[in-house]
Regions:
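Sec-dependent N-terminal signal peptides
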Residues: 4-13
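Tandem repeat scaffolds
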Residues: 17-119
């Protein structure tokens, strides 16, 4: 019985450490499918990051800084943009919809209309 409890605790600890966040997001981006879905990136400093084709569905981007980042082809459906900064970010070919919150800044010519990014 003690072995089962110990194994359960170890497995739980491994899964708890594997949540995508602002400290380990690179591991998730570099994985198959660039899966950063539901990633917790609140306040993350991603200035100039190259996130082409990233799956950011449902990610919490609250207060994150994406200034001059490259998000071409990224999937942003259901992400939380509250207070995020996307000044100068490259958003060509993104997939968006059901975006929550209002970002502080978007790239020139872009707007958020009914949860969808439009240029």
């Amino acid at each position: 019985m003690k072995k089962i409890i110990l194994i359960t605790m170890l497995i739980s600890a491994l899964f708890a450490q594997s949540d995508c966040n602002k400290k380990n997001w690179q591991e998730y981006y570099n994985s198959d499918g660039r899966d950063m879905s539901d990633c917790q990136l609140q306040g993350a400093m991603l200035r100039g990051a190259r996130l082409m084709g990233a799956d950011l569905t449902g990610a919490d981007l609250t207060g994150a800084n994406f200034t001059q980042s490259r998000l071409m082809g990224a999937d942003l459906i259901g992400a939380n943009f509250t207070g995020a900064n996307f000044t100068g970010a490259k958003l060509v070919g993104i997939i968006s919809g059901d975006i929550r919150g209002v970002p502080d800044n978007l790239p020139e010519g872009w707007s958020l209309v009914d949860g969808t990014l439009i240029k």
